[in-house]
Amino acid sequence: MEQMEQRKQTEQIRGSQSIVFTDAPYIISAASVVGSKEGEGPLGKFFDMTSQDDQFGEKTWEEAESTMQKEACVLALGKARIKAEEIRYLFGGDLLRQGVATSMGVEALQIPMFGLFGACSTSGEA
């Protein structure tokens, strides 16, 4: 069984910077983390986590953005009842210096990440 799983994973990788999936990927969970202004808006009740501190307890906006990314990933993993090591790839991006907040925020999860550099189009590209 382990050998078959290893072969399947190897078949997904094509070249040094591209992958091809044998089975189409799909979304099994999602999470949203916002600041107080978003939480007070008309969609407020739909967010998974709303912080009353717009800097999420961090010293800088950059660190706050990283914390938001990390919290969203941790919440999504929890909702799906899976562990970070069960995730093969993470596709992520942000509006801050083309992915620095995302890469720093999810670093501790140790999930291989594809950085998406499209600002607002990141969600559509993923």
Describe the predicted segments one by one.
Residues M1-F114:
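Conserved "HGTGT" condensation-loop signature of ketosynthase/thiolase-family condensing enzymes
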Residues F117-A126:
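Active-site-proximal alpha-helical scaffold in enzymes
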